[in-house]
Each structure stands twice: as C-alpha cells, then as structure tokens.
Amino acid sequence: MKPVTCCNQKNNIMPSLVPVCCSEKKIESDAKKSISKCCGDKEIYDSENRPITKEDGSWIPGSCKQCRSDPHSRNFCQSLSNKCSSSSFSSNSALSPDLNEQQTDVNYNSIKLPEICSCKNAQMNAASDAKRYLPISYTYQKIRQHMQKNKSIQEQLNPEDSTSISSALENIASGLHVRGQKVELQSIKDALHKMDKNVLE
C-alpha cells in the first residue's frame, strides 16, 4: 500500500476520499464505522468528541471533548439545551438515533456560511438546507469562524471579554432549530444573516 500525500505529509491511509487532502481511516481496528481524516482538519468526529450518553438514551450538553476544552463551546451547547424543553431535548436524542448518526461522512468543511443567493433557485436551496443538519460541535466552529472573519463583528466584541462573546453566541443559539444533537443548516444561515444585519444597522 503506497502512502498518500495529505497536506504535504505522507500518510499510510487508503483510499483517498478527496483529492490531495482527505482519506478514510477506521478509528480502531475493531471500529464499526469509518471516518474522514485529514491532517489539516483539527476536528475529527470520533467517540472522544461525542457527549456523554445517559442510560435512557439522552445526552449531557457540554460534555463532549470540545466543550470540556472550550468554555464558549460548552455555553453554546448548553444554551441550545436550555432553549428546548428538557423533555423534547431528551426525547429527540433518545428517539432519533438515526438523525444523530446520519451524514457522519459528510465533508462539513465544504459548507460555507453564510450563503446569500438572490438567484431563482434560492428558495430551492433554502428548502434543501432545511433538511440538512450539522453536529452542534461543528455548528459552533462554523459560527466562531464567521465571527472571527467579520471585522464589523470583531469591532463590537471584546476578545478579552468572555461575557460579550458568550452573549453573542447565546443570541445566535436562540434562533437555531435543534433536533437531537444536530442543528438545521438553514437556521444557522438565517441566524448569521440576522447577526450581520444587526451589525450593519
């Protein structure tokens, strides 16, 4: 088996899923699922980055590896949990395992946020995005990236003030549609558009 060059590094991972960069690898020899691995992608969705699951099938918001290492991620996740009633949040997690597991092989890096389209198929795109969901942990990453790239938002936020960042994330979380451990893609875009609009006004 020949090594694959990934981000200028050679990896003994085959076959290549995406030209040059990503390859498929099983987490462990006895792992049931394969995951996408790229040396340039810091977040790999393995068992370590999944939240703690209770015996009844519900999960504990803020308990995944990312949330334990990033207070803002933990607050964001818990804000989504508080937004929903505890019963619906738990039942969605317990009764919708397929939704939580679906699209695990999606290349989330290919999703651009926000995406504003004035063309005729904009409504079709919105309808399609309403059926697509991202993991909460990756939703947080996308939102943080958007906030960091937007200079107008950065001017209003004090990077050294944890409270201002948490408040902004909580405001965004209030407009997101959550099912189980995933967030509706279209609601993420709508929330970011609203945030950008408020900054410009």
From Swiss-Prot:
<protein>
    <recommendedName>
        <fullName>Uncharacterized protein YOL029C</fullName>
    </recommendedName>
</protein>
<comment type="subunit">
    <text>Interacts with the chaperones HSP82 and HSC82.</text>
</comment>
